[in-house]
């Protein structure tokens, strides 16, 4: 487990609006809630809007990052996903966590203050040390340079 400090940027968090929590003991990610001045906002069909979380995290440890993911129920039932599909929080970022919500459906969707809109997952990472080569010394792999579905559907 990694200890991650956070700042509360909106005084309603921890009272009127719950702080991030793991929904169950087996949950991999914390639920992040919508924080804005209004009681609700409407995302029109195909609209993308940046929604605040009212929180800032400082992961600090360069061996970790945060990944922001959509909530599966919002995407499946309502067409609400992340505008950038997945978000990355670098360990040295200290600003407010904002969620780009995109309504990819043809129906307006009302986002309510305090609604769970995304998930925040902390993952270990490894920074690579890249070095140029003319060719790869290892023998050709089974995959080689094939990509984009080259192994077929079945």
From Swiss-Prot:
Its cofactor is Mg(2+). Gene3D superfamilies: 2.70.40.10. SUPFAM superfamilies: dUTPase-like (SSF51283). It comes from the Bacteria. Its EC number is 3.6.1.23. Pathway: Pyrimidine metabolism; dUMP biosynthesis; dUMP from dCTP (dUTP route): step 2/2. It catalyses: dUTP + H2O = dUMP + diphosphate + H(+). Substrate binds at residues 71-73, 84, 88-90, 98. One of its GO terms (biological process) is dUMP biosynthetic process. It is an enzyme of class 3 (hydrolase). InterPro entries: dUTPase, dUTPase-like, dUTPase-like_sf, dUTPase_trimeric. It holds the Pfam family dUTPase. One of its GO terms (molecular function) is magnesium ion binding. The keyword Metal-binding applies. The keyword Metal-binding applies. HAMAP family: dUTPase_bact. PANTHER family: DEOXYURIDINE 5'-TRIPHOSPHATE NUCLEOTIDOHYDROLASE. Belongs to the dUTPase family. This enzyme is involved in nucleotide metabolism: it produces dUMP, the immediate precursor of thymidine nucleotides and it decreases the intracellular concentration of dUTP so that uracil cannot be incorporated into DNA. This is Deoxyuridine 5'-triphosphate nucleotidohydrolase. It comes from Dichelobacter nodosus (strain VCS1703A). The gene is dut.
